[in-house]
């Protein structure tokens, strides 16, 4: 795989040739309901300093998350492990693509240290895709979970994983480490995979989530999608059914925002009332929790949502017992 610089936006960020050679797409003006404040608070600065001092990477920065100001002000951050270079070139994603560096053996300890420094009660850990590794990075995920458990036993752990495609036994390694929440995003409906997520397979991702529940039914499972990529409403409803058939507990739905002209265009901006309807429908389909709004992202309000998940499961068990 060759790594090139995308000089079109003069950012100096590493890009896979496929991204650099894509035709420019118009970037639509965002509607008023997607406006966010610039990150300038004291809490934001303190979080950034902790991240920098521990030489950590966050998906908040790498993916250009619109909620970074709100989350970092509250000293919430989603740590991205195994480097900042991904082996895939998804059309929606702003993370750099190329040949990754070797794993940092000190990363589990550094993540655990940051969790303790920030006083996190709930931490979200994600990663780039590492197709170059024999286990896809599963063992490294497990080591990070173990380190956080030892440093901050009271902190609940949520992971957002790649699909471990063609990595036999990888999922079992991660599940054995017993995260509290296992998140793997479908990202979009199956008809859009060839253009949006060409390196992945929709039904493999569904099966991955189902397998987590088979291995350990106590782990909460979660998945998210973006809308505004040209999908049809009935495709979203079918995707919900697919997730429920895999016994997924929690679904997130947010608006796709185009990072640069080289990325997949926004086909439309979905209005807030339509997001609300997805939330209502999702709950009737049996999800314990559905978060659906223009600015919803996988890790947004993750700590609060974990508390809601626990309460919803307890209420469900109580209703079955009565």
From Swiss-Prot:
SMART domains per UniProt: Elp3 (SM00729)
Positions contributing to [4Fe-4S] cluster 2 binding: 86, 90, 93
Keyword presence, Cytoplasm: yes
Listed pathway(s): Protein modification; protein lipoylation via endogenous pathway; protein N(6)-(lipoyl)lysine from octanoyl-[acyl-carrier-protein]: step 2/2
Single Gene Ontology MF annotation: 4 iron, 4 sulfur cluster binding
Feature: compositional bias, Polar residues: 1-12
Its EC number(s): 2.8.1.8
Region named Disordered: 1-22
PANTHER family associated with the record: LIPOYL SYNTHASE, LIPOYL SYNTHASE, MITOCHONDRIAL
Protein name, entry field: Lipoyl synthase
Gene name tied to this protein: lipA
